[in-house]
Amino acid sequence: MSSKLFARLGTLHWSWAAVFSLIVGGGLLTACGGGGQIEPFKPSRVLAFGDELSVIEPDGRKYSINAFKQVTGSGGTLVDDPTTLDCARDPIWVQAVASAFGLAFDRCLGTATVASGQVLAQVGHKVSDLPAQILGVQGAVLGEKDIALVMLGMNDILEIYAEYPRLSRDALISLARARGRALGRLINDLALRGPAVVVLTVPDISLSPFALAQNTSTGDPTRSKLIFDLVKVFNDNTSIELINDGRLIGLIYADIETQNMVEFPSSFNLSNVTAAACKDTAPLPNCTTATLKDAVPPAAAPTATSWLWADDLRLSPAGHSRLGQLAASRAVNNPF
């Protein structure tokens, strides 16, 4: 019996006598006279759930800074073809995890010839939308050969924040707590249906250009602190609710990693962690490396890899790259 099946039996609150009866009577013992090594986890399908931080549009555009296809120029060097986007360049975090297992999403095959992943995430979606996303999975039923990637909650936090000051801070904190716990329960349900699950908490958007601007535009310098509190309460309650046996769910603290990138930008080769790189005339997902803001001397012009934020809320490829590295490492090394 796989370690994951043992984990699921345990979460169902069965008696161990009943489990033993099921094992012996149902033929679930797979070997006798000795054990064997647990095989490395090798999923055959990847599923992306969440909001725009995990979306690849049908035409390959992402809610970040999109890159162009590279072609060989007249001098024999690679140059960008400004007429053709390349969805495999500057990947978002879910693509990094898929690549770690040799999988590819149907909306961005890259060099793959067969799709082995589905993007169920949708722009603007919130915690309450996750069940419908799961129901939208096409093909085989969810199982142990699937890996599910989840990052959700940014739009919940923004929706809750928008109620201030009509609702008090304490009321908003209570709402964030409830949404976070609801997400944790939904993720548990997903994990118990079979797939390995990798979860990213909501990035710390209190450090985003949007939050920093709120301190000024509202005349209230504590607005970003309120957003920080909402993010923290939401993420803390999601993680508290998750099944914590080490085998069903792998958790990445994207909020803490965002804080690290802002506090120690040079460690991540970042030159700007406070401003949006994309021009206002090229809203996501229409932003490309050709629609970035002009340089404001003495600072250098933004690039996809040196600025943290694509727009006032969404991460650049640099941010996605770091989160993708962490998520891929967790997915590969977690004992699913």
Where are these regions (language model features)?
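Sec-dependent bacterial lipoprotein signal peptides
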Residues: M1-T30
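Conserved active-site regions of diverse hydrolases
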Residues: C32-F336
